[in-house]
Each structure stands twice: as structure tokens, then as C-alpha cells.
């Protein structure tokens, strides 16, 4: 494709999206520029603190469990109190809990605060996705979710490379930088983003649409099927931040080496997400999710045969292609399955 063609494709990819979307996009980018804990927690615990890989796995599991628990409550808050208040509470709580985690030394305290960090950081997800669905036209949603995922990984590509060198100097500095950047996100939300929750009408509720509860969500067979399969794929992708750093550490590589390798994930997404999305946005999401799951399994399976930085980087490139296809497709499908009055609750998956 010519340079003019690339410019035209870029313009078409960002055209027609409302200003509120771009402020939400900016908040996401700022948040990911400060990302540190999720990327380097395993290395921090095993290399800096001297704990075992099994303990690092336990902490990662508690961090994930906190996210699962909080997403249920955050989904209800998003629908009941609004997207904006939920975002503000989640981001301020994340900033304080991440800073606190950097000062913890006792293994029980580390595990407990990691659980709180997981709760706080994941609480913003239902609100972000519901707000994005509110403010973007249905035909533009896959593109909008892809651009948001692109922002996540643009920030991640920069932060992961920088964080590797920060970790060589001070892990505590990484925790404090993430806390500060998360507070900056809260400021953007507070100053620039209005509430987007659709107004309830007299026809809602018993006289019109049935009210949406968590029980309604759990009884939705199609949605729960998507959630179950997405959970399995998410467990696989999580190995990029748990299994991969431990494998590289055991092979004698440094945190900076891991930061360089995992940085390929963000760089590839930044380069390929927009053109790939233009190719897949009108295709059957079921087929796309199947292809992405197979590609993810293949990519992570290759890690067993990696022994050099180049091969580790190659494995990251393979499963990153799966992530590029999976992320906007899965999020767009969830929004399609969710009723307007229950968007927050439906984003918990």
C-alpha cells in the first residue's frame, strides 16, 4: 500500500468518532503509559524479593481473583450510579493500592494488597466499555474498541521497555509512577468526561423492558457461553505476564531483557491493529475467535522451545497476532449481546 493509501486508511479509521471517545481514549493511553505492576510483578517477587515461582503464581491468582470479584460489583455500580462515578472511584482506589503495594514486605501483606489492586484496577473496565458503547454508534463500535485496544498497547509498548530499566534501578519507583499516572487518568475523567448512561424512561422496568440484574446475565446462555470461552483464552494470554517472565528469569535473562521482549507485543499491536481491524470488522466474529484461540495456543506452546531472546520475541509475535484479532472482536460481541439498560453488568465478563 502506498503512503497516500496508508494516510487515507488512518483517516478513515479515526473519522466520525465523538470527542468524548477521544478523551476516554486519552485516559486509557495515560493509564497504560504508567503500567508496571501487571508486567513486572512476577519478576519483582522472584528476583527482587526472593520468593518462589509458586508464590508469584499465588499472588497473580489473587490479583486476578480480586478483578473477578470487583467486576461484578463494578458492573452493578456502572448501571446504577453511572459510568463516570465508577471510573473515578476505581482509578483513585487503584492509585492508592498500587502505591501501598510498593511498600509491602510481608508475604501475607503483599498477597492481600495484590488482591486489592486487582479489585481496584479491574473495577474500571465495565465502566469504560459501557461508556464507549454509549457514546459510539453501533456500526463504529468494533473500530472504537480496536482503537482503545491500540491505545492500551501503545502505552504498554512504551511503558514495558521503560519499566525494564526502571526495575533495574528501583521497583518502588515503578509502583509510584504507576500510582501517579493512574491519578492523572482520574483527573482526565473528572475534568473532560460527562456522564453517558442513557436516561431511564417511564417505559423501563415492569411496564416496559424487564430490569436487568446479575441473575439476568447469568441466565443468558449465549452471553455466558462467550464469557466461558473468553475466560479460557484470557488464562492463556495471561501467561505472557506470568509464565513468560518466570521462564526467561530461569533461563538467566534480566528484567530489561523481558521488557524488551514483551515490548514487541505492544509495538506489533500499534503497527497492525488498525489495518487488521479494517480487514476483520465485517467478518463473522465466531470464526475470528476460533482462529485467534488456535493462534494463541500455538504461540505460547512455542515458548517451551525458546532459548534465546530472538526466539522468545518470535513467540510473543505469534500470540500477539491472536490478541490483535481477539480483543476487539470479543468486546464488540459482548456489547452486541448486552441490552442498553444492562451494559455495565454485561461488561463483567
Q: What are the roles of these predicted feature ranges?
A:
Residues 148-190:
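Helix-loop-helix hairpin linking two adjacent transmembrane segments in secondary transporters
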Residues 2-18, 194-228:
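Juxtamembrane intracellular "pre-TM" segments in multi-pass secondary transporters
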Residues 70-82, 272-285:
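Helix-to-loop junctions at the C-terminal end of transmembrane segments
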Residues 36, 64-72, 156-157, 266-274:
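Residue-level signature of mid-helix packing/kink "hotspots" within the transmembrane helices
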Residues 17-64, 222-229, 233-261:
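Helix-loop boundary and gating motifs at the non-cytosolic
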Residues 68-105:
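Conserved MFS/SLC helix-loop-helix module at the cytosolic interface between two early adjacent transmembrane helices
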Residues 114-152:
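Cytoplasmic helix-loop-helix junction between adjacent transmembrane helices
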Residues 85-99, 287-302:
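Structural signature of the two symmetry-related core transmembrane helices
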Amino acid at each position: 500500500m502506498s503512503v497516500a493509501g496508508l494516510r487515507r486508511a488512518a483517516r478513515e479509521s479515526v473519522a466520525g468518532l465523538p470527542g468524548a471517545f477521544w478523551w476516554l481514549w486519552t485516559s486509557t493511553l495515560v493509564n497504560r503509559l504508567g503500567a508496571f505492576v501487571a508486567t513486572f510483578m512476577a519478576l519483582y517477587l522472584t528476583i527482587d524479593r526472593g520468593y518462589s515461582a509458586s508464590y508469584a503464581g499465588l499472588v497473580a491468582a489473587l490479583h486476578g481473583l480480586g478483578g473477578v470479584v470487583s467486576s461484578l460489583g463494578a458492573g452493578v455500580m456502572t448501571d446504577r450510579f453511572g459510568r463516570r462515578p465508577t471510573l473515578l472511584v476505581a482509578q483513585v482506589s487503584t492509585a492508592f493500592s498500587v502505591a501501598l503495594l510498593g511498600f509491602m514486605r510481608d508475604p501475607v501483606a503483599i498477597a492481600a494488597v495484590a488482591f486489592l489492586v486487582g479489585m481496584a484496577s479491574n473495577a474500571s473496565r465495565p465502566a469504560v466499555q459501557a461508556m464507549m458503547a454509549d457514546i459510539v454508534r453501533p456500526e463504529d463500535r468494533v473500530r472504537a474498541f480496536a482503537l482503545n485496544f491500540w491505545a492500551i498497547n501503545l502505552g504498554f509498548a512504551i511503558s514495558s521497555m521503560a519499566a525494564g530499566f526502571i526495575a533495574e534501578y528501583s521497583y518502588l519507583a515503578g509502583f509510584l509512577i504507576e500510582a501517579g499516572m493512574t491519578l492523572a487518568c482520574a483527573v482526565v475523567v473528572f475534568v473532560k468526561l460527562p456522564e453517558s448512561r442513557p436516561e431511564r424512561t417511564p417505559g423501563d422496568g415492569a411496564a416496559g423492558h424487564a430490569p436487568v440484574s446479575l441473575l439476568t446475565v447469568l441466565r443468558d446462555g449465549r452471553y455466558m457461553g462467550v464469557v466461558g470461552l473468553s475466560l479460557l483464552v484470557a488464562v492463556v494470554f495471561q501467561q505472557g505476564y506470568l509464565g513468560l517472565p518466570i521462564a526467561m528469569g530461569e533461563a538467566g535473562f534480566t528484567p530489561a531483557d523481558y521488557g524488551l521482549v514483551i515490548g514487541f507485543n505492544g509495538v506489533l499491536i500499534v503497527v497492525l491493529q488498525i489495518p487488521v481491524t479494517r480487514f476483520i470488522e465485517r467478518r463473522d466474529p465466531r470464526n475470528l475467535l476460533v482462529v485467534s484461540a488456535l493462534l494463541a495456543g500455538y504461540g505460547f506452546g512455542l515458548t517451551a522451545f525458546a532459548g534465546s531472546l530472538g526466539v522468545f520475541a518470535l513467540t510473543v509475535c505469534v500470540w500477539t497476532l491472536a490478541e490483535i484479532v481477539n480483543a476487539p472482536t470479543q468486546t464488540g460481541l459482548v456489547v452486541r449481546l448486552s441490552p442498553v439498560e444492562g451494559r455495565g453488568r454485561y461488561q463483567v465478563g
